[in-house]
Amino acid sequence: MGTRVRIKLEAITGKNTEIVALLNSGAESPEPSIVIPTEIAEELRLNELKAETAYSEEATRYVKVKLYKKAVKGTLLDNGEELTSVILDVVVVEGLIEPLLTDSAIDAFNIEIISFSKGLWRIRGESKVRESV
C-alpha cells in the first residue's frame, strides 16, 4: 500500500499547490527534500528559478535531475488541518510517477511511520494515529 500524506507546497515564485506524496525512507537526502515530476514543477513555475544540475542514484544507475535549494515551504495537512511546516529543497525528475518525501524530509516533518504496509503514521510525540491518503 505505501504511506502517503497530503502536502501544501508554497513556492518562492508565489505559486501554490496541494499534492499527495509518498513517504520513501529509501530516498536519502542530506537536506529535507521533496521529489516531484516536471508537471508539478511547471505548475509552481520553478523553471523561473536557477536550478543546479545534480545526479540521483536509482538502483543501478544515476539519473540527471534539477535541484532547487530551499524553493518551497511544505505544510503537512490532515483533513485540512495544518500540522507542521518545513522549508524544502525540490528535486525535479522527468517521468516521475508520483511525488515523494525523502528520509530527511520525513524526519523534518516529525512523521513517525507506524506501518508502511497499512499506511499508518503519526506526528512524533503524539498518540493520534493517522491513515494514508
Please tell me what each predicted stretch does:
Residues M1-V133:
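Pepsin/retropepsin-fold aspartyl endopeptidases
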